[in-house]
């Protein structure tokens, strides 16, 4: 399996996510770019999760149906062809970092998968449901990790 390179001009891998992208700031999605999407992908799937949340992994963003020929998107935009899903805050779209005050540094895993078939998701998918849906269809993936604390 090949690897997708996922990057952001807003923050480096394993570095702090800017406040403007958080729920305390403008709550806008980060600019992202990707390369090395393999041939044969039917779509890309983007997920952002916080595994350090007190109640278990928290869904901050889920976008399916992303055009596999695309290479990224600007800050505050939806990836080309993408369909946004409800996040853990109950809103459709991006929900920026908002860890509990004093809870320490949280990690935000941005995962981009190239999949062989469109995912079958319904309602308000959980992080676990997305991981299960991707399993067996993943052609390649890439991960970018940002951090945030309050």
Question: Which residue ranges define each predicted feature?
Answer:
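N-terminus-centered regions that define maturation/targeting leaders and the start
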Residues: 1-150
């Amino acid at each position: 399996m090949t690897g997708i390179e996922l990057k952001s001009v807003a923050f480096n891998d394993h570095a702090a996510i800017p406040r403007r992208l958080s729920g305390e700031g403008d709550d806008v999605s980060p600019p992202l770019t990707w390369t090395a999407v393999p041939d044969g992908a039917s779509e890309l799937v983007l997920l952002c999760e916080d595994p350090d949340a007190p109640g278990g992994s928290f869904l901050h963003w889920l976008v399916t149906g992303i055009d596999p020929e695309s290479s990224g998107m600007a800050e505050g935009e939806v990836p080309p062809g993408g369909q946004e899903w409800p996040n853990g805050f109950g809103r459709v779209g991006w929900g920026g970092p908002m860890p509990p005050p004093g809870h320490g540094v949280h990690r935000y895993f941005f995962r981009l998968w190239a999949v062989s078939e469109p995912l079958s998701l319904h309602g308000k998918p959980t992080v676990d449901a997305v991981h299960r849906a991707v399993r067996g269809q993943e052609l390649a993936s890439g991960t970018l990790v940002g951090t945030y604390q309050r």
